[in-house]
């Protein structure tokens, strides 16, 4: 089983990110589960969502404490939470940022992981460029597919289009493809 924890803030599409990830996995014939963890928080408050992917039925229902991958949609959370808590040795880290890991103050931890398992991509900028809104979730889904190899881009494309129709879907797919290509090139 591959387990993903997504950290962000309310309004960034954290819950939708896990839903689209699980849809993409399902479209590839896998079993998947997506669920959020939040209370009555408002826009801007920290939110966590989870996704499990496996080739067999998933019976677990609890939050993911030991993820194989973490996606950080908002790097300001580094000061508020230990977003890396429980990350599996050799796990994957995808961060929405154009800043260096040194500037973010996380390079020492990330140096303990395989270099090809760690990447930052300016997903918010890609979302603004392609969708016109600062919601990085679809772009980060493209980056996730590239860094982990767990999903094919065609499944990511289909999952995004299932969630968002028309021009919004097209823009989100374009942002996801740009992130996918940026992560592959990194």
What does each of the following model-derived ranges do?
Residues 1-186:
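Active-site cofactor/cluster-binding pocket
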């Amino acid at each position: 089983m591959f387990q993903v924890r997504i950290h962000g803030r309310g309004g960034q599409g954290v819950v939708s990110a896990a839903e689209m990830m699980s849809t993409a996995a399902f479209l590839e014939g896998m079993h998947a589960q997506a669920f959020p963890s939040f209370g009555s928080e408002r826009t801007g408050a920290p939110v966590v969502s989870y996704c499990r992917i496996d080739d067999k039925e998933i019976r677990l229902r609890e939050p993911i404490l030991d993820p194989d991958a973490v996606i950080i949609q908002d790097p300001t959370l580094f000061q508020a939470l230990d977003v890396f808590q429980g990350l599996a040795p050799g796990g994957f880290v995808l961060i929405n940022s154009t800043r260096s890991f040194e500037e973010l103050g996380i390079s020492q931890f990330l140096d303990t992981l395989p270099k090809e398992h760690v990447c930052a991509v300016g997903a918010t900028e890609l979302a603004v460029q392609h969708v016109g809104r600062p919601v990085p979730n679809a772009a980060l889904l493209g980056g996730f597919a590239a860094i982990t190899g767990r999903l094919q881009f065609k499944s990511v494309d289909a999952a995004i289009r299932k969630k968002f129709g028309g021009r919004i879907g097209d823009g989100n797919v374009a942002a996801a493809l740009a992130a996918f290509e940026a992560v592959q090139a990194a």
